Regions:
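Hydrophobic membrane-insertion alpha-helices, especially the h-region
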Residues: 10-28
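Alpha-helical transmembrane signal-anchor/signal-peptide segments
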Residues: 29-52
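Short extracytoplasmic
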Residues: 45-69
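Loop/turn elements at helix/coil->beta-strand transitions in domains of secreted/extracellular proteins
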Residues: 64-66, 89, 116-120, 242-247, ...
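Membrane-embedded segments
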Residues: 70, 74-156
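Conserved, well-ordered alpha-helix/loop/beta-strand core segments that scaffold catalytic motifs
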Residues: 121, 202-285
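Secreted/periplasmic serine-hydrolase-like ester/acetyl group-modifying domain
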Residues: 124-125, 134, 138-241, 337-372
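C-terminal regions of proteins
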Residues: 276-372
Length: 372
């Protein structure tokens, strides 16, 4: 019996020592920058796309920056280096693929809370989420690490005793340091950026059947109220509470194939009404610059720019930054009526079946329009 107790004590003692070592290693390296500023003189930090939700919190709290690029996959290919050059800023990028308006707004709020130097925010307003549920959180894209965002220290157990954090982050960073890998933070241009993809009509449309017409449904009162709530609570409230920060927002330019699917589903009218609501709510806000390029045919009607119905190539991200810096595509009280009229005319009258006639791109890369 005594021998059994000794073995039990030895086992428990060993287990506690091992747990303490894991906790100590995670806290000391802190790969997600949860506790402190990154130790850029000791370790190599390389934010990974598969851990976007986990590392964004630490980046926003502990990196040095005065500009923020934030959003979903619509922002993943946006380059901090180009933003720095165009706007004369020092930017970071925090992205979360498929995130809701609530989640992206929470990242903005976190940055504004912890960084009084923040003077510029660039964000894409995903048009698919205009009328989503007010507190929507998209778990289908992966778990949301609440323990990294709340203020409950007891929840940190999910971080400091996390197998993925240990094996995919701490140990590789420790080995890099031992092997003399240059410490620092990897280029955030690459954070979340896609590998080379296949673009063109076949990839964008992913259909063989022709587009059909349908009776269009008007926007319901319930959806209208959701749109107004979302834009007021997740866009305007942040800008109004931070008058010294300038917010560059843009409507994410989806392809004509997406608009064709909307029309076939009878949702084109509702989508146009939602967009108009969003625009008219935002325009009076003095520190928001709202941009849209939905009516630029060389962009939205050329499927060589898209790998699916909504995701555009990295050259589009570059172009949009350049457009924002030069003020092109800015919506104002003087041009909004012409823009809304032009957009409605384009997407209501376009023959979407002509999209099948577009040739496949000869090679990967930006169409000529974006090379001018």
């Amino acid at each position: 019996m005594k021998r059994q107790k000794n073995w039990t004590g030895l086992f428990l003692g060993t287990a506690l020592v091992c747990l303490a070592l894991v906790v100590g290693l995670t806290v000391s390296i802190d790969p997600y920058m949860h506790y402190r500023r990154p130790q850029l003189d000791k370790f190599r930090y390389e934010p990974k796309a598969e851990a976007e939700r986990s590392i964004n919190n630490g980046m926003l709290r502990h990196l040095d920056y005065d500009a923020l690029l934030v959003g979903t996959s619509m922002m993943e290919n946006t380059k901090t280096s180009l933003a720095d050059s165009l706007f004369g800023c020092r930017s970071i990028k925090t992205v979360s693929i498929g995130a809701s308006w609530w989640e992206i707004s929470s990242l903005e709020a976190l940055a504004l809370e912890h960084n009084p130097e923040l003077s510029l925010v660039v964000r894409g307003l995903d048009m698919t989420y205009f009328d989503e549920a007010p507190q929507a959180l998209h778990y289908e894209i992966g778990p949301y690490p609440t323990y990294l965002y709340n203020d409950n220290p007891l929840d940190d157990v999910y971080y400091v005793l996390n197998r993925d954090v240990l094996y995919s982050n701490c140990l590789p960073m420790l080995l890099d340091a031992a092997e003399g890998v240059t410490p620092g933070l990897s280029n955030l241009d690459d954070y979340g950026a896609w590998k080379q993809e296949v673009y063109g009509p076949r990839a964008a449309m992913r259909r063989d059947a022709p587009y059909a017409d349908a009776v269009q449904e008007a926007l319901s009162d319930q959806r209208r109220e959701r749109v107004l709530y979302n834009v007021r609570e997740k866009v305007l409230s942040l800008a109004e509470a931070n008058p010294d920060t300038v917010f560059y927002y843009f409507l994410t330019p989806y392809s004509a194939a997406w608009w064709g699917d909307l029309r076939q589903a009878g949702q084109l009218e509702a989508q146009l009404e939602m967009e108009e609501l969003v625009i008219r709510e935002i325009l009076p806000c003095g520190n928001i610059r709202l941009f849209s390029w939905n009516t630029v045919r060389e962009l939205t009607f050329d499927l060589a720019n898209y790998k699916d119905r909504i995701h555009y190539g990295p050259w589009v991200n570059d172009w949009m930054l350049e457009q924002m810096a030069s003020g092109e595509g800015l919506l104002t009280k003087d041009n909004v009526e012409a823009y809304l009229s032009r957009e409605r005319e384009l997407f209501e009258t376009f023959d979407y079946n002509t999209l099948f006639d577009q040739p496949e791109p000869a090679q990967y890369g930006a169409p000529e329009f974006f090379l001018q």
